[in-house]
Amino acid sequence: MVQLSRFFTVLSVATVSLALIVGRDVAKVKADIATITTQVTTLDNAIQAFPLSGGSLLNALTIHNTATGLITTLNGATTDVTSTGPLGEADGRAVLTSVEAIQPVILDALTNIVVKKPGFASLPIGGLPALILQDLKNLKTATSAFATALVANAPADLVEEAKTVQTTITNAFDPAIAAYS
């Protein structure tokens, strides 16, 4: 009886520990999405502010550096989502809602980067459009991996909605990549 009691005590402690770890991981994923939201907004604002002509190399490199930071954040967030495992219903809904909220900003940034291509091409450094193309490709890869991890861990009833968001966002990169290719 004493051994059985110890077993249940150990099992209870392990269960509580696991629940706390999963809770922390979900909190980390939510924090990652908040950081991604801030970085996407910063990137979109920098692209919007870049003029069609007469822009500066410093402003163009700021856009590049912001994109590079976003790629790093997306890669870290992908690792966090993967290590968290399947999300519960409430957390899955919260995460999906957060991603849906930044979708218009992502789409706006990708539309504007195409519109601003003449401004980047007019700068005295010839390789800038190629640098932007590389950033776009890397952003698409990182975004796709993050979205794939989210879909894989979404509750079953949210998978289709998550896939729709994933498809919309990753497909939005194609016209931008084509414009700079």
Predicted regions and their residues:
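Fungal secretory targeting signals
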Residues: 1-25
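Mature, structured extracellular domains of secreted fungal proteins
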Residues: 20-181
